[in-house]
Amino acid sequence: MTDSNNSRSARTIAVTAGRPQNENDPLNASIVLASNFQSSGDYARTHGTSTWAALEQAVGELEGGQCLSFATGMAAASAILFALHPSIVVVPSVSYLGVRALLSDMQDHGHVRVVSVDIVDTEAVVKAIKAASAEVGAERVVLWIETPTNPTLDEAELEELCVAANASDIKTVVDSTFASPIGQQPLQFGATVVMHSGTKFIGGHSDLMIGLTLTNDAEVFEKLSRARVVQGATPGALEAFLALRGLRTLPLRYEAATKNANEICRRLQTHSAIEWAKNVGPMLSYIVKGGATAADRVCATASMIITATSLGGVETTMERRQKYAGDAHVNPGLIRMSVGIEDVEDIWADLEKALAS
C-alpha cells in the first residue's frame, strides 16, 4: 500500500520505502528463499514473500498506487491483458515489439482485435476508442499507451488521453518503462494500470528481469493478483531484492543519465552525419545518414558504447532497431541509445569516432 499523504521527494522515497520497521530488524529487506511457510497455509506463489512486498511497497510509494511484481515485464503485460480481458485493444502503431507480438498472437487466436493508432494524434486516438466502445461496449475496450514510445520516442498527451478514456469508462494501460517512476506518474492522470519492465531503469544494472504493475482500482488489483497466481508469473527472490536495491539509486541514476543524454543529443542535432536526433530522459534515438549500412558501421565501430538490445543500465548501450522483424517499419538508419552515467565527454568521444567511420 502507498502512503497517500506522503509529501517526501522521490529521491527520499526511493531510499527509505520498503525497509523493515521493527526493532532489531536488518536495515535492508532480506532475500527470502521460500516457497512454503509453517502453519499459516501461505504459499509463495499465492501469498508472496516479504522480499516482494518490500519492492512493491517502494515502487507503489513512488508511483502512488498498489504495486504487484512479476517475473518479467512481458509477464506483467500478459497479466494485464488476462485481467482486463478486452475485446479491442487500441495500441500505438510504434511501440515495444514484445507487446505488439503478444497482441498479434492473441488476435491470430481470435482473443482480441488490435487497432493501431498514431499515439501523438490525440484526436485520432480518442476517435478510435470511442468507435471501439460503440462497437463492443466500453468495458471491453483497453487503451494501451506507451509514452515515450520505443524506439522513436514519440510522446503522447498522457493526461488528455486518460481524461478522455475515463470520460468514456474505458480502461487505460500506460507502459511507463522508458519514463520510469521518476519521469512520470500516470496514475495521477487517471490511468487504470501502469506497467514497468523493472529489468530496465528500476533495476538499473542489467542483471535481473522483473515486471511491475500499479493501479488504484481495487477490483483491477485483485484481478491482477489473480492473474499472477494462475499464470505463475512470480518474481524470483534475488530478482526482487536486486530490483529494490537498484531502486534506491534510481533518481540519481536517472538524473545523471538524462543530463548526459541531453548533451549528447544537443551535439548530435548539429552533427553532419546525423539526420535527426531526439531524447526523452536518458533514452536517445537518432538517424544516421546513409541508412542501415552507415548505422551498422557506427554500432560496430564504437568501443566503449556497447551494442546491446536492452536498456536502462548504468552503461551506455545502442543498437539499430530496424534489423528486428518486429521493428521493420522503423527508419533503417535509426539507432536507439540508452545513455548511461559515464563521463559525458567519454561517451561523446566514442560516438564521435564511430560517426566518423
Regions found by a protein language model. Give the residues of each.
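N-terminal "arm"/small-domain region of PLP-dependent enzymes with the aminotransferase-like
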Residues: 1-58
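Conserved PLP-enzyme active-site core in the AAT-like
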Residues: 2-6, 16, 23, 67-278
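Short amphipathic alpha-helices in soluble, non-transmembrane regions
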Residues: 224, 296-303, 350-355
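PLP-dependent enzyme catalytic core of the Aspartate aminotransferase-like
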Residues: 8-11, 113-115, 126-135, 168, ...
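Short loop segments at secondary-structure junctions
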Residues: 36-37, 215-220, 247, 287-293
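Conserved C-terminal alpha-helix-loop-beta "cap" of PLP-dependent enzymes
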Residues: 280-335, 339
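A short, N-terminal amphipathic alpha-helix
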Residues: 58-63, 267
